[in-house]
């Protein structure tokens, strides 16, 4: 499980680096994206796809399943490829690239790229520490600061990223989504099997380790593919030999 978390951390750093090294004309990100304001009644929220500030994980670790749904009011609608950020205590750096459609708390901001092809690039921009530091400069409140929506949209980034940057951030973000889903499957499997192992209900002596070895070979193949992605992602900036 930790392998996928660590791997995604590296991939996200690559995305950040790509966005940061764009040297074109800078513009406020309000030219690249908008904040979603679409709302629906809370009874339309589904637990599997509902995102709260609590379900978003600190230090840019994506999200986990929400523990409950709101009982009153409205929720914000998000779509696949939107970027969700908790607006409570921005210094916790809670951010997630949506891989599905769903709803979220009003304290979760939904950024949507005006050009869908730039959604991974937008995620790379918003994922940077410098963005969260910028948001904190405009935050209001002491015990529980909230970011200023207008202020954060004035954060600047390159307005017209190169095609290779768009392609690379897209490849990397797609792999991040795949890894997240694989990690979710393994987590669910662990939660089911571990109690059975502890109770002795499952006898490990009867496990077919040839299947396990086959799975490991597939993981090695996936790692080989990723080793090809890295030099593509950072042409001229990164070398696997460094």
Protein language model features and the residues they cover:
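Alpha-helix initiation and N-capping motif
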Residues: 26, 44, 119, 128, ...
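Sequence-specific dsDNA recognition surfaces
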Residues: 30-80, 100, 104-105, 233, ...
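Non-catalytic DNA-recognition/assembly elements of restriction-modification systems
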Residues: 1-42, 56-59, 163-164, 170-205, ...
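C-terminal, helix-dominated tail/subdomain
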Residues: 204, 211-220
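Extended hydrophobic-aromatic, low-complexity segments
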Residues: 95, 120-121, 133-135, 162-166, ...
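A short beta-sheet element
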Residues: 80-132, 136-140, 144-152
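Active-site lining segments that contact anionic ligands and/or coordinate catalytic metals
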Residues: 105-106, 152-154, 189, 199
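Short, well-ordered beta-strand elements within core beta-sheets of diverse protein domains
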Residues: 109-113, 153-158, 170-177
